[in-house]
Amino acid sequence: MKYTVTIRGKLREKQAAAKKYHDDVTGATKDAAKKAGDLTHVVYLDPQDPQAFFGIDTWSSLEGLQAFAGSPQIREFFGKLFEGDPEVHVWVDSDWNKW
């Protein structure tokens, strides 16, 4: 089973500074995330609100996701990247029609 995680939040800094911080941290943690089961990581930005952030990750392991996301380093990362707590939701695939 795959788990899709959505993260919606307000960036604490302007986009350029937030991107640098995000890319530095995710670059440094990519191997650990992949080892824990993170298959994909994608960020979307709102063209009408430069502080809006929407991320989608796909995980192969719920246990790996929970361990990685609950680590002090990732909690610190979220605290520095976002104003307040972002909305984080875990979703599972359905057998509904797709295209």
Would you name each region that the model predicts?
Residues 1-70, 84-99:
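Short S/T/G/P-rich N-terminal loop/turn motif that feeds into the first structured element of a domain
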Residues 29-30, 75-77:
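A common structural junction motif
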Residues 78-83:
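Short, conserved catalytic or adaptor-binding loops enriched in Gly and charged residues
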